């Protein structure tokens, strides 16, 4: 049931984005040919890039991508339900340099490593934070 809801969600996202943007995706066939877990590390100069990339990659990658999302974005009230739907992981804010944030970051790294070893795929937008 969850997979059907996720497919519908990404379909609606693509439809909404199509109203404003023309997107051309090259190389999806190469992703479809991959077997096993995938770690995707795209760049995103605009805030619209993550939903655009995710909505198109969702169809291409055999295993659903689990995004890692910065905590400031993750907890935006209207985005939080979507974050839970797509099973995003929250990346803690390390700018405060707290021990709890560092521990959460280490736990997240361990979770991603275990996930990759277990066959899961992830998408991480490196931002230097």
Identify the residue ranges that each predicted region occupies:
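Soluble catalytic domains of membrane acyltransferases
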Residues: 19-129
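Residue-level preference for long, well-ordered alpha-helices that form the structural scaffold
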Residues: 1, 5, 101-104
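Short hydrophobic helices that act as membrane-entry/anchoring signals
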Residues: 2-21, 80, 84
């Amino acid at each position: 049931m969850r997979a059907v809801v996720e497919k519908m969600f990404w379909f609606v996202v693509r439809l909404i984005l199509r109203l404003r943007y023309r997107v051309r995706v090259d190389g999806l066939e190469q992703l479809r040919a991959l077997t096993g877990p995938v770690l995707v590390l795209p760049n995103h100069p605009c805030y619209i890039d993550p939903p655009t990339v995710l909505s198109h990659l969702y169809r291409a990658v055999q295993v659903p991508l689990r995004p890692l999302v910065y905590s400031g974005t993750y907890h935006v009230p209207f985005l939080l339900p979507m974050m839970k739907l797509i099973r995003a992981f929250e990346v803690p804010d390390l700018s405060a340099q707290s021990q709890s944030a560092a521990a959460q970051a280490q736990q997240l790294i361990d979770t991603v490593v275990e996930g990759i070893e277990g066959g899961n795929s992830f998408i991480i937008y490196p931002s230097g934070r």
